[in-house]
Amino acid sequence: MKNKYFTSRDPIKNYFPLPNEVFDLGLSPGALAVYSYLMYIEDRTTYQCHASYRTIGSAVNMSPNTVRKYVTELVERGLIQTERTTIITQDGRKQNGSLLYTLLPIQFSIQQFYEQKLAKLDAECEQERIRKRLEAFQLAQ
C-alpha cells in the first residue's frame, strides 16, 4: 500500500545545491544561513535573485538589520554582489526596490580566502624574523 502522505523526492524540485567549500571559508552561522537562503531562491540560469532584508529575515528567523550585517559580510568575502534597484509606482514616483543579489562563483572567494591567510602568515613570519634579529642585536651589545 502506497503511503499518500509522503511525496516522492525529486532532486530537481526539492533540493538546492550548496557548495561544500562554503564550510571552509570560516563564515559566521548567520552569514551561512543567509547565503543558503539566497542559493535556495536564486535563478539557476542567471545566478541572481531579488529579496528584501525583511523577506530573508523571515525565512532565516533574523531581523532585517541582522540580515544586512550578514549580507555585508558575504559581499566582503566575495560570495555575492548586490545592486540597488528602483521601481516606478502607479502614480509615476520612483522608489527604492529590493536588492538584486548576484551569487558569484565560489572559486574566487576560496582563492581570496587563502591569499589572505598566506598574507597573514607572511606578515607573522616577517615579524618573527625581525624579532630574532632584534634579539641577536641586543645580545651582541
Model-derived features: positions:
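Generic structural signal for residues positioned in beta-strands
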Residues: 33, 100-102, 140
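N-terminal intrinsically disordered, low-complexity, charged/polar
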Residues: 1-10, 22-24, 120, 126-141
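Generic alpha-helical secondary structure signal
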Residues: 19, 39-44, 57, 74, ...
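Short recognition helix of helix-turn-helix/winged-helix DNA-binding domains
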Residues: 1-66, 94
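Small/flexible residues
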Residues: 6, 11, 40, 46, ...
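Generic signature of intrinsically disordered, low-complexity, basic-rich segments
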Residues: 27-32, 115, 132, 136
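Winged-helix/helix-turn-helix nucleic-acid-interaction surface
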Residues: 65-132
